[in-house]
């Protein structure tokens, strides 16, 4: 595996005078080595593995208790008693009735962690994973750091979320290394799987509703349940910052509800510190790749059921390559808050009284969420297939094999220079690496007479569940390409800004970059308030690859950098063009519309353009992108969002919409950052 060596480079953006401020410095990271834990599993009996002596290290301040004890502690807590009395006065409902309701909520959500269920899953998952994965690779150094952290302070596990099996995989890995299996926040969807949901409960899952609908009692019970487990050190708490799986393989913007809950004991000085552990789970081939494409094209996801699980047994005959699980360094909440946040406001009222979060605390929670996601992204392992599919999507979907290998090697070097965690087998020839990648994804690409062809140019007019096969294949390919964008987002945005800015004055390029970053801030993870630093990072990487040079007030492009610029703008072209298409689509909307109506119209409008060969932008069909675009349109003032009869409706600002479409199409100058909003 090639891993960039540590180095440090610096450059300044701005005046070239001696007094100019050094604005950016970037260190290339060196990652831990991986160990394949399936190697040992293939040598030892699965039953012996499941029944091994399991003595995980415990938090030094642990309060020993059973799952039933946790429920009792929650029901008798000052917080729940206070909320019940408040609600009783407000709703004129008896305290006993509300207490019974709280008990029912707890029965619905709580876990029943038992060692027997953990051993059962260890046995089953060992067999399944050996069948469908070549390797399950884990960085042992990260495991060792986690082992120490678990004994010192309460631990929050924050994995990336790409597949249903993420949480199962994580529990399997922790059991393998004799670490405590976490309690896991799971969606209520799983309750439809009767036997499975009970097994999940007994392996540590606790269930939460997608929305609480203003139910104060539910929120109080749920938050107190999570905080009780955290304060007692019962087990590491695991949840997904994204809230749901990313269907398009890009990290979704974070949800803050659970993060607020687990940070509160620290804010109220109920715990000395809390460790956050970002975990990056990378798949060579995503199990749900076709299911995701269907969902993005408007087909609702199948309801979770035991029958559906049994039907999914067909995946046992497929090869999904390898999984890489990277445990990041534990991050101390106390260290993050030092000099950044005052907890004094929490001393002014009793702990049991719910209080509105101060603005500085809200900003801090938001910042922590984005920082954790950026750490997840930094440690996501990239497979060679991502390079191959990104190149093919920019080369008319077909390419000579030798030319593809040459271009893939070129992109390999660029990815590593940009700081990407690329997994490239050093013991294989480049031709073998590319060929094995194509073979693993033979449902999407094939090698015919020295030509590599993406299987997206189907002549078949036969519909699949009302969908065009070509659209399904394109979105599956796009999902793999999207994984590269985590590494290339900032230099790509600078490249697009350079393309859209006449004259190449640094100030104008920065204005355009700021505008684009704002437009696409729901598509990619950018730390709020970090625009200048993101611009500097993008410029630094383009200077490092000799794409451009910085002078006092201007940017000079080099002939040597044409290939890099062309590739980077090509990576972002689908997003710019998709937002243009959706801007035009808005002008065809009625006076007001719901999100559901917008998605139907957007899909229909885009399909018409594709059918008429007026566009080749298949990414605009993605419902995930369409929702992100709508959020951006609201933020930019292109669309107004109002609540009417408990439902949200949207109104189009016609002139602002036309202006946005013109700006994205380079027909109108962007303007200065202060006036970049529409």
Swiss-Prot record:
Its main location: membrane. The modification Phosphoserine is found at residues 12, 17. Expressed in liver (at protein level). GO terms for biological process: cerebellum morphogenesis; ether lipid biosynthetic process; glycerophospholipid metabolic process; membrane organization; myelination; paranodal junction assembly; response to fatty acid; response to nutrient. Its EC number is 2.3.1.42. It catalyses: dihydroxyacetone phosphate + an acyl-CoA = a 1-acylglycerone 3-phosphate + CoA; dihydroxyacetone phosphate + hexadecanoyl-CoA = 1-hexadecanoylglycerone 3-phosphate + CoA. SUPFAM superfamilies: Glycerol-3-phosphate (1)-acyltransferase. PANTHER family: DIHYDROXYACETONE PHOSPHATE ACYLTRANSFERASE, GLYCEROL-3-PHOSPHATE ACYLTRANSFERASE. This is Dihydroxyacetone phosphate acyltransferase.
């Amino acid at each position: 595996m090639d891993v960039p060596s540590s180095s440090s480079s610096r450059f300044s953006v701005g005046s070239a005078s001696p007094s100019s401020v050094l604005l950016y410095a970037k260190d290339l990271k060196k990652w831990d080595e991986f160990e394949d834990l399936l190697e040992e599993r293939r040598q030892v009996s699965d039953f012996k593995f499941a029944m091994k002596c399991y003595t995980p290290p415990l938090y030094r301040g642990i309060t020993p208790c059973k799952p039933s004890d946790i429920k009792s502690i929650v029901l008798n807590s000052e917080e729940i008693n206070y909320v019940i009395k408040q609600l009783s006065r407000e709703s004129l409902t008896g305290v006993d009735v509300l207490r019974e309701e709280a008990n029912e909520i707890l029965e619905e959500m709580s876990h029943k962690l038992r060692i027997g269920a953990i051993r059962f899953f260890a046995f089953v998952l060992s067999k399944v994973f050996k069948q469908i994965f070549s390797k399950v690779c884990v960085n042992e150094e990260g495991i060792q750091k986690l082992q120490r952290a678990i004994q010192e302070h309460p631990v929050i596990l924050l994995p990336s979320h790409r597949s249903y099996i993420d949480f199962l995989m994580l529990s399997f890995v922790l059991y393998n290394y004799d670490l405590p299996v976490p309690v896991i926040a799971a969606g209520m969807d799983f309750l439809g799987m009767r036997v499975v949901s009970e097994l999940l409960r007994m392996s540590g899952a606790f269930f939460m509703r997608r929305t609480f609908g203003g139910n104060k009692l539910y929120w109080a019970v749920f938050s107190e349940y999570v905080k009780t487990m955290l304060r007692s050190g019962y087990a590491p708490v695991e949840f997904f910052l994204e809230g749901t799986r990313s269907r398009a393989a890009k990290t979704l913007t974070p949800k803050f509800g659970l993060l607020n809950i687990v940070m509160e004991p620290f804010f109220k000085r109920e715990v000395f510190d809390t460790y956050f552990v970002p975990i990056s789970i990378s798949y060579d081939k995503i199990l749900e790749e076709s299911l995701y494409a269907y969902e993005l094209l408007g087909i609702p996801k199948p309801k979770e059921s035991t029958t559906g699980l049994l039907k999914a047994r067909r995946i046992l005959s497929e090869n999904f390559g390898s999984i890489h699980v990277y445990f990041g360094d534990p991050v101390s909440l106390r260290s993050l808050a030092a000099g950044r946040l005052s907890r004094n406001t929490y001393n002014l009222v009793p702990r049991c009284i719910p209080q509105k979060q101060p603005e500085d605390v809200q900003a801090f929670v938001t910042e922590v969420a984005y920082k954790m996601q950026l750490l997840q992204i930094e440690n996501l392992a990239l497979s060679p297939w991502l390079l191959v599919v990104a190149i093919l999507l920019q080369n008319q979907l077909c390419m000579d094999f030798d030319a593809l290998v040459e271009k893939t090697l070129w992109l390999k070097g660029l990815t590593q220079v940009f700081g990407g965690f690329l997994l490239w087998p050093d013991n294989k020839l480049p031709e073998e690496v590319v060929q094995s990648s194509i073979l693993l994804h033979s449902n999407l690409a094939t090698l015919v007479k020295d030509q590599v062809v993406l299987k997206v140019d189907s002549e078949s007019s036969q519909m699949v569940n009302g969908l065009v096969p070509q659209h399904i294949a394109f979105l599956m390919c796009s999902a793999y390409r999207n994984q590269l964008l985590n590494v290339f987002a900032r230099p790509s945005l600078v490249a697009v800004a350079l393309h859209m800015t006449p004259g190449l004055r640094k100030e104008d390029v920065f204005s355009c970059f700021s505008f684009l970053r704002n437009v696409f801030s729901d598509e990619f993870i950018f730390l709020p308030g970090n625009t200048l630093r993101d611009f500097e990072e993008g410029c630094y990487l383009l200077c490092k690859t000799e794409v451009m040079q910085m002078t006092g007030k201007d940017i000079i492009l080099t002939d040597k950098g044409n290939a890099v610029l062309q590739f980077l703008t090509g990576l972002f072209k689908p997003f710019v063009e998709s937002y243009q298409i959706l801007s035009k689509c808005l002008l065809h909307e009625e006076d007001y519309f719901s999100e559901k109506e917008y998605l139907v119209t957007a899909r229909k409008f885009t399909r018409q353009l594709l059918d008429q060969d007026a566009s080749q932008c298949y990414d605009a069909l993605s419902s995930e992108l369409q929702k992100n675009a709508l959020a951006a349109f609201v933020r930019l003032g292109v669309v107004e969002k109002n609540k009417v009869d408990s439902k949200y409706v949207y109104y189009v600002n016609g002139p602002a919409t036309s202006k946005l479409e013109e700006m994205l199409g380079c027909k109108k100058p962007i303007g200065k950052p202060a006036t970049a909003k529409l």
